[in-house]
Amino acid sequence: SIRNIELNDRQLQKVRDQFIFQCYTGLSWVDLYMFDYDRCTVEHNGVAYIDGERIKTGTKFYTPILTPAMEILKKYDYKFTVPTVQSFNRSLKIIAELIGLKKPLTSHIARHTFATTVVLANDVPIETLSKMLGHTKVSVTQVYAKILNSSVEKHAEKLNSII
């Protein structure tokens, strides 16, 4: 897996870790590039949140820094040096080849992973995900929210037990 592969190249290690950070925060590449922990995080009930503004749209977003993301932040002393998007995606392509991934791996895939695998698969409402991603309309978030078969099956079981 991308998390466990042994990488000898320092640049590949950093990009891998930053990609995983994106998977657990939903940040786009440009928001990761501009991320400043001291300037845009707040703490509430012992959980750190990114309280920021999307670079692309200027829309406010508010998302938790989940434990795996916080571990990565600590590893890099809360500061990332993010390469250009081209270099970032080139590194991800190399990593994908090393782990035998057939589909292309890009920084934007991390944002989709956050939306589907991390958030929606754990029954977080789409309206909450929309706020986390900094979308002004839930209809934009629905592009990310391809309904997962497992979610349909789980809810069907719940409905069958009620009816």
Task: Identify the function of each model-found stretch.
Residues R54-I94, T106:
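C-terminal catalytic core of Y-nucleophile DNA break-rejoin enzymes
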Residues N4, M34, V143-K146:
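Phosphate-coordinating loops and pocket residues in cytosolic domains that bind phosphorylated ligands
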Residues S1-I2, T25, M34-I72:
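Conserved tyrosine-mediated DNA breakage-rejoining catalytic core shared by Y-recombinases
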Residues L12-R16, V85, N89, R111-H112:
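Short, leucine-enriched amphipathic alpha-helices that occur as contiguous helical runs
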Residues L159-I163:
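C-terminal secondary-structure termini that scaffold catalytic or DNA-interacting sites
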Residues R54-G58, L133-K158:
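Catalytic-site neighborhood detector that most strongly recognizes the C-terminal catalytic loop/helix
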Residues S1-W29, N122:
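Basic, Lys/Arg- and aromatic-enriched nucleic-acid-binding interface segment
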Residues I20, Y24, D31, R111-T136, ...:
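C-terminal catalytic core of tyrosine-transesterase DNA break-rejoin enzymes
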